[in-house]
Amino acid sequence: VGFKAGVKDYKLTYYTPDYETKDTDILAAFRVTPQPGVPPEEAGAAVAAESSTGTWTTVWTDGLTSLDRYKGRCYHIEPVAGEENQYIAYVAYPLDLFEEGSVTNMFTSIVGNVFGFKALRALRLEDLRIPPAYSKTFQGPPHGIQVERDKLNKYGRPLLGCTIKPKLGLSAKNYGRAVYECLRGGLDFTKDDENVNSQPFMRWRDRFLFCAEALYKAQAETGEIKGHYLNATAGTCEEMIKRAVFARELGVPIVMHDYLTGGFTANTSLAHYCRDNGLLLHIHRAMHAVIDRQKNHGMHFRVLAKALRLSGGDHIHAGTVVGKLEGERDITLGFVDLLRDDFIEKDRSRGIYFTQDWVSLPGVIPVASGGIHVWHMPALTEIFGDDSVLQFGGGTLGHPWGNAPGAVANRVALEACVKARNEGRDLAREGNEIIREASKWSPELAAACEVWKEIKFEFPAMDTL
């Protein structure tokens, strides 16, 4: 028969508006900004083609396979309200296009080449629907929310953390001292900063030893289980696992990884190691804003959050809504639910484009961190609820009397907010009053209230629908 060589419009093959999506399809919602003169159907079809089976011209080898079985399909396009020349293109991918249990492969396919495509001015992946048929091929988080609570024996309240500052420059012994004071004062966790790996002023092994010592001393004195996120992120996967092994040998409860800079392959390996060896895994999202901050290009953080739940992590940073970093309330709560819950309904007002069913994959605890202090505590308790980690770096270490009193202030504020909430008080309305009352019987909290009474980070949010 021969085949018809030449270049033909993508939309003839890849735009299929009458396609019925299958339960096993991976669905993607892209925000497409076509170049002038490119019709939206062609742009949407081009995205489907270039992220699945297509190439720029008809090829003879197409005849050796069944394109109908394997091609991505753009099945719906809608204009974005209030934006000129922007469309949401919905693409369905057959499950067979993806390697099982590999976030790396999923992203290489869906967001690999297509983002440099000339016919598009910009392209953003807004959401993915991961079908159970695919999510069940992943281990997911090493432990999940309930197992973590049981390991730590902490229930009915958010957990408290603190990133040790100055993030770079402390010796291991001084670093360990800062860890001890924070944990002794009443925090549940302290944290290595994301860029603390193994630098000349503090090699990883020394830090691990001094932090473990700090942890056990604080545990003995408070009778509570304590943790310090030991950052295992390293230049090679082998070195990363070596650090995790040493953490396990020290008997500490939790390690940490920078999952975007470290990469999904490394992260998934570490998550498997953590489940096999009883370590919790804290995930930092360093580099996320490079990918997710532009409104019209890149990937929304909710996609990176879903990818992390597949790859594996027990905590992940998720913005604060109130501090110094990005995060609009409804949108943030949208992906917080995607991290914690088993079943999340489609809700476009929160940026959730698809109903997501995680079946039995464990949940991830969202971490609120960045520019928050005691006055934010009522809002954070209300917004994030019990299954969260509230992390105050400067908001602990910046206390005028030092780290331990800073930790005391945060713990007192948190306990006051939880108690008030359980008594039925309205944290949003009475928050300041609740903190003021509590500070009457806690000099540490009173001092903290005084220092940060006027601090706000007020800028318009970038992350809008």
From Swiss-Prot:
This protein's encoding gene: rbcL
N6,N6,N6-trimethyllysine carried by residues: K4
UniProt xrefs under InterPro entries: RuBisCO (IPR033966), RuBisCo_large_chain_AS (IPR020878), RuBisCO_lsu_C (IPR000685), RuBisCO_lsu_C_sf (IPR036376), RuBisCO_lsu_fd_N (IPR017443), RuBisCO_lsu_N_sf (IPR036422), RuBisCO_lsuI (IPR020888)
Species of origin: Humiria balsamifera (Tauroniro)
Protein name: Ribulose bisphosphate carboxylase large chain
Note on how the cofactor is bound: Binds 1 Mg(2+) ion per subunit.
Active site: K165 (proton acceptor), H284 (proton acceptor)
Cofactor(s) recorded in Swiss-Prot or TrEMBL: Mg(2+)
Top EC class, one word: lyase
NCBIfam families linked to this entry: PRK04208.1
Post-translational modification: The disulfide bond which can form in the large chain dimeric partners within the hexadecamer appears to be associated with oxidative stress and protein turnover.
Keyword Magnesium recorded: yes
Phylogenetic placement of the source organism: Eukaryota, Viridiplantae, Streptophyta, Embryophyta, Tracheophyta
Residues holding substrate: N113, T163, K167, R285, H317, S369
Site (Transition state stabilizer): K324
Compartment(s): Plastid, Chloroplast
Note: The basic functional RuBisCO is composed of a large chain homodimer in a 'head-to-tail' conformation. In form I RuBisCO this homodimer is arranged in a barrel-like tetramer with the small subunits forming a tetrameric 'cap' on each end of the 'barrel'.
Catalytic reaction list: 2 (2R)-3-phosphoglycerate + 2 H(+) = D-ribulose 1,5-bisphosphate + CO2 + H2O; D-ribulose 1,5-bisphosphate + O2 = 2-phosphoglycolate + (2R)-3-phosphoglycerate + 2 H(+)
Family to which the UniProt record says this protein belongs: Belongs to the RuBisCO large chain family. Type I subfamily.
Subunit note: Heterohexadecamer of 8 large chains and 8 small chains; disulfide-linked. The disulfide link is formed within the large subunit homodimers.
Predominant cellular place of this UniProt entry's protein: plastid
GO biological process terms on file: photorespiration; reductive pentose-phosphate cycle
This protein's UniProt keywords: Calvin cycle, Carbon dioxide fixation, Chloroplast, Disulfide bond, Lyase, Magnesium, Metal-binding, Methylation, Monooxygenase, Oxidoreductase, Photorespiration, Photosynthesis, Plastid
An annotated GO cellular component: chloroplast
